[in-house]
Amino acid sequence: GLIDAHAHIESPAAALRALKSGVTTARVLGDTYRQALGTRDLIRAGHVPGPELLVSPGHIRPKPGLAFFMVYPQFGDAIDGELRGAERIAEATRALIAEDADVIKVGASERAGLVSTDPRKPELTEDEMRAAVTEAAKKGLYVAAHAHGREGAANAVRAGVRSIEHGTWVDDETLAEMKRRGTFFVPTLAVMSPRGDPQGNAA
């Protein structure tokens, strides 16, 4: 079967669609209200059909969003500010691990597609991401970094993440370092396909 290295499958219906498309394993990088975790557990228990799901129960970043705070209220003091500092990021990583995470997702750069964010701008620092990598490694897990921007991607690679997700503005120097370290690159090309010319360059 196919492996979808970057997906957002949060329901049995979505899981079934993926399976019918030939996907037998998918990494679900980010969850909303534990829906992906629940779907994963239903599949593993044999209650519903679907691919094997490897789930990150959240997306650790300075402004993780309302859903994160509702699932992890212990970080509520940051709801009007930012989740910052290596120890706080390590704590957030432990919280995701306690939810039976298969992988940890961190934000190395801001999100794309929103008027309020600049995807080229770095988010978590190298030290903060290294704290997540260290905590994940204690449980035999790895970290995937959402990284559009050049600086954020470079920070994430130096921090020791296993994979760079998106990598829109990643430069040759960082790609060379990724090759040296064995860091995987997941370019998520399907994200861009709806924005392209469906006819291609016919000339």
Predicted segments, located by residue:
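Di-metal (Zn2+ and/or Mg2+/Mn2+) metal-binding site signature of metallo-dependent hydrolases
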Residues: 1-17
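Short catalytic-loop micro-motif centered on adjacent basic/acidic residues
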Residues: 3-5, 25-29, 142-144, 162-165
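Short beta->alpha connector loops
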Residues: 7-10, 30-34, 148-150, 166-171
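Divalent-metal coordination cores built from histidine and acidic residues
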Residues: 15-141, 174-201
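Structural recognition of alpha->loop->beta junctions
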Residues: 100, 154-174
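Active-site proximal loops enriched in glycine and acidic residues that flank catalytic Cys/His/Asp
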Residues: 108, 147, 165-168, 187-189
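Aromatic-lined carbohydrate-recognition surfaces of secreted/lumenal glycan-active proteins
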Residues: 140, 146-149, 153
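A general structural motif
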Residues: 167, 202-203
